[in-house]
Amino acid sequence: MKALYPGSFDPLTLGHLDLIKRGCSLFGEVVIAVLENPTKSPTFSLESRIAQIKDATKEIRGVEVCSFKGLTVEFAKRKNADLILRGLRAMSDFEYELQIAHTNRTLNQNYETVFLATEAHFSFLSSSVVKEVAAFGGEINHMVPERVATELQQKFK
Amino acid sequence: MKALYPGSFDPLTLGHLDLIKRGCSLFGEVVIAVLENPTKSPTFSLESRIAQIKDATKEIRGVEVCSFKGLTVEFAKRKNADLILRGLRAMSDFEYELQIAHTNRTLNQNYETVFLATEAHFSFLSSSVVKEVAAFGGEINHMVPERVATELQQKFK
Amino acid sequence: MKALYPGSFDPLTLGHLDLIKRGCSLFGEVVIAVLENPTKSPTFSLESRIAQIKDATKEIRGVEVCSFKGLTVEFAKRKNADLILRGLRAMSDFEYELQIAHTNRTLNQNYETVFLATEAHFSFLSSSVVKEVAAFGGEINHMVPERVATELQQKFK
Amino acid sequence: MKALYPGSFDPLTLGHLDLIKRGCSLFGEVVIAVLENPTKSPTFSLESRIAQIKDATKEIRGVEVCSFKGLTVEFAKRKNADLILRGLRAMSDFEYELQIAHTNRTLNQNYETVFLATEAHFSFLSSSVVKEVAAFGGEINHMVPERVATELQQKFK
Amino acid sequence: MKALYPGSFDPLTLGHLDLIKRGCSLFGEVVIAVLENPTKSPTFSLESRIAQIKDATKEIRGVEVCSFKGLTVEFAKRKNADLILRGLRAMSDFEYELQIAHTNRTLNQNYETVFLATEAHFSFLSSSVVKEVAAFGGEINHMVPERVATELQQKFK
Amino acid sequence: MKALYPGSFDPLTLGHLDLIKRGCSLFGEVVIAVLENPTKSPTFSLESRIAQIKDATKEIRGVEVCSFKGLTVEFAKRKNADLILRGLRAMSDFEYELQIAHTNRTLNQNYETVFLATEAHFSFLSSSVVKEVAAFGGEINHMVPERVATELQQKFK
């Protein structure tokens, strides 16, 4: 099966990476879809984020990396995905995730959002926490892939 | 009884409309008070929002539509309302709603905030979700009244 | 308006009493409906609970105290109530309350459950906490009306 | 793919049934595994529950109904399932579900628990709510399949 | 400082043990107070639980193990403790913990309940989950100290 | 013991002040560390906030007031603090607080974040609620120390 894993990945964390690995081993194929949102000003450009994800996933079979604009359900259809994959952290905005899953189902009944529980020791991790720690010069190697750590530290030097 | 239903209604959703109908049949009168908040830049002007609400509620007996600035409890007093009405969605910011209700009671003991549970199938709906879907060209007729859908689609064309 | 306030009140707490007073001043009449639930073995008999509530509310205009078996919405109809009243504590089982409110609306569209936020300093209070403290000989006068405190202390002597 | 959908189903609700249909169309095969839990005294015997589920799912392709004792991950392995399927209601015990999903992963890394968001209008529904309403003679046809409604009403007559 | 760490510890988990170690290094002394609750029928007797805790903490400086009946705040006073220590798991009953902390403060203003966040990878762990897995013959060595694992497995053989 | 109490305190509320008093009586010393966050535009300048806090705490023994930039755990180390102190309101972002506590522990194992439950009647209070009420000319004397109330009212005149 082919799963679409949408997100801003600004930047990719080890929690995202864990979910990608588990998604690939469970469904076989995961399309990592980086959302290009004109209303937001991301820390990393779309190109950098795609390069970071490609670098971090180059050893994982069944991964495709791309970007998209517009509705997730429409992009899932264009990519012939079977489902939309999302992670649920104990400390995540559970209500927001259910709200988006319900909204997507009203837009296209065929697209289920499938949730996997994020690993317990990644449950405190989010891109915003990583950026806050990096901005203050803190250690982030246990939070993000190597290349992301290097590029973040350069950005906040 | 007269209920004051305050909010930004940017824009009005079918969830709001359902609550207005139920408020009117329960209490007899509902004053829909559109908050004019100088610190925010709404998607629709105050005039458009008032026109949208008037259009959507023209068949409902006991509805008044107006705008206000300043404290909700003070406006409730000016409008001779008996209570403040708010909706609670399973997927709403329950803690924020209770925080505002407590704050309002410390400002004026006479004004109770009365909560009604939003209909289950509207529990995923919020103005921000509607705008996000509309911005990406998604179908919103099942989320907002007709006039709001048309005006939103024009805005994001 | 007439509100039906259903519960087991095993025993009545100062949080319940606060809600009864606010319900009466807001709606005019509150029917306190003590649920007789054959599947549960309450600490106080139905008669004791009704006597405790009558004693605690004797100074409050617009209060009626009675018991009922079966569905809340059906009893509300029999008592000609206009709505069902429930309290929401920050530390209450919000999801359970919404679940019951939705269930009741599917059983009888005419019966809305109206929630009031429990006073902040009562938000930690529940009948089970009161009984736990009383069982261990703790001070409970700041949690329950006087008669309830006396009868609880006798029970756990 | 083959999903294992474990639960007590005491009794099966329309929320469960909706999840079974969506699981089958998404994964192709769903094994409905009724947990036989010696420490609990269910309302319906294991046989009745299995018969009810078989009756309600007879038109759905890819469904298998059976019972099991012991650990879910071990039974999933015995049935050659690819994953464990669970529903997440906005008003469900999200934290308990994540707790069980994490526990199962520590017991067998190969078994992911995949969550689907329960349909919004079923989000208030649970077996315990159904039994409570039925016990008080309330209408339950909008909550459970026909056969379950009939057998529940006979039980509580 | 001396912290009182009350609980039923039925049985002690690695999450409890982690909190005990962190409490000792932070405050110097931790009194592990096993609650003897006549209204409950524990899996392990009071003596077994005390023996298990003593065995698991024998290498930790500053630990005392005892049992108590009645109010936590009163026992804290009898033991000359400075504060009450509790763990908060992301997946714990946060509202129940706050409810008990508030209740204890109304009973004795001098006793603060101090919370530490349970380690992320223990956040799914609780005594009831451990017993459920053990009852079904599952692996529990990653959840409880060795002696507890052995005694649990004997109990459920 | 010395506790570091970090925050933006923009402005100090009576809820903060209550926690400072309780922290001092529990640990002996509390360093109130006002975070200087270049990415945010606070309502009050750093100097005004420090002056407000010094004024409000001048009668409390064991208080030190200062500001810091960068990582909380690093500043805690520089100030020789023994722990980080935070308040938990029933209506606070519990998940965000746990996320920060876990993050800080991964950055420096030696720094525990210790939580105290905010007093029940302050549980609805936050700096943002205070500013919203003050902006609309509402009464705030029951929410903030006197000097803060005066300065806020001047700011929003």
Swiss-Prot record, chains A, B, C, D, E, F:
Catalytic activity from the UniProt record: (R)-4'-phosphopantetheine + ATP + H(+) = 3'-dephospho-CoA + diphosphate
Positions marked as site (Transition state stabilizer): 16
Gene3D superfamilies linked: HUPs (3.40.50.620)
Binding residue positions for ATP: 8-9, 16, 87-89, 97, 122-128
Gene Ontology CC: one annotated term: cytoplasm
Main subcellular localisation: cytoplasm
Superkingdom, natural source: Bacteria
Cystine pairings recorded for this chain: none
Needed co-factor(s): Mg(2+)
SUPFAM superfamilies: Nucleotidylyl transferase
Name this polypeptide is given: Phosphopantetheine adenylyltransferase
Organism encoding this protein: Prochlorococcus marinus (strain MIT 9211)
